[in-house]
Amino acid sequence: MISLRLYAKQGFHSDLKEAYLRVNKLILVLSFVLLSSNGLAVQKVIYPSMENIRETRFQDLFEILEQALDITRPDFGDYELSPTPFPMTESRMLQEVKSGKIIDVIWSSTSPKKEEELRPIRIPLRKGILGYRISFIHKEHQIIFDQVNTVDDLKKFHVGQGIGWGDIDVYKHNNIPVSYAPYTTLFSLIGPRRFNLFPRGVNEIYKEYAVHGESNPTLTIEDGIVLYYPWPYYFFTSKENEKLAIRLEAGLARMIKDGSFEAIFNKYNADAIRKAELGKRRLITLENPFIPAETPLNRSELWFKPALDSLN
């Protein structure tokens, strides 16, 4: 009797141990399956925070970035998107993304130097609309700009730009004088003491006026001229972060195919395009020799094309 009880007790513990091992094995298998289905570990993606907390001029690019990462979850896994803990100038951002230590991705205009030092994702994020420029001017100077019709006319004026902006080289190449200062101070410097006009992308100027107009009562939007020079804006990663670059390329391609890329463009730009009335403005084209040969200018679906025939 005692031996039977002992056997039963031992058998019970043996069965319990076997069940425990089976459960552990099942947990390991499930963990492996879950890891496999999620791709790999969570991909951390750090982008630069804005110079001014009130700024919304890059909200569309953030939305594109987030959507490109979302749409590629099935193939590349989950991600964690976060800004840097402190703002940076464009020059600093370029340095940091190159090193890959603080920033993983930036958005910026392109140039041969940037494409040599960084890894470009060659899809123009705003369809090149930044190449169409309307200017902030002093409110008393519209009568002066009514007489401006050519690049030679522009050479009489100083253009304002942010520190480290690639546009500086474009204006210098066209022999237009340039002054530069931190972005947040540019709106208060327009006038005879510093510079005469501050060209902004069609998609930027109305939003910026809503933010900075009230605190700068002499600021106004010039109403007769549109400048143009090819100016694509890309995502850039470090050359070593090929995994993120490939993921962003895949995500943007899918967004173009499913229409979400165009939807974001229209969401953020349609109102500004309507307000700008580009067909009623005098078109002044500037040379931009700093566009890399690899720029996909032949892919018409990637570019914003206003009714240029209606421009004077």
Regions found by a protein language model. Give the residues of each.
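Extracytoplasmic small-molecule ligand-binding "clamshell" domains
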Residues: V42-E117, L248
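N-terminal signal peptide c-region/cleavage motif recognized by signal peptidases
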Residues: S36-S37
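A ligand-binding cleft/hinge motif common to bilobed small-molecule-binding domains
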Residues: V105-E117, F198-T218
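Periplasmic-binding protein-like
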Residues: S49-E51, F58, G128-I134, H138, ...
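A conserved helix-loop-strand patch within extracytoplasmic ligand-binding domains
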Residues: P124-D169
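Short loop->beta-strand "edge-of-pocket" segments that line small-molecule binding or catalytic clefts
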Residues: Q43-F58, Q147-G164, N196-L197
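Short helices/loops that flank or line small-molecule/ion binding pockets
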Residues: T84-I103, H173-N174, T184-N203
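Ligand-binding cleft/hinge of the Venus flytrap
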Residues: L65-E80, Q147-D153, G162-T184, Y209-N216
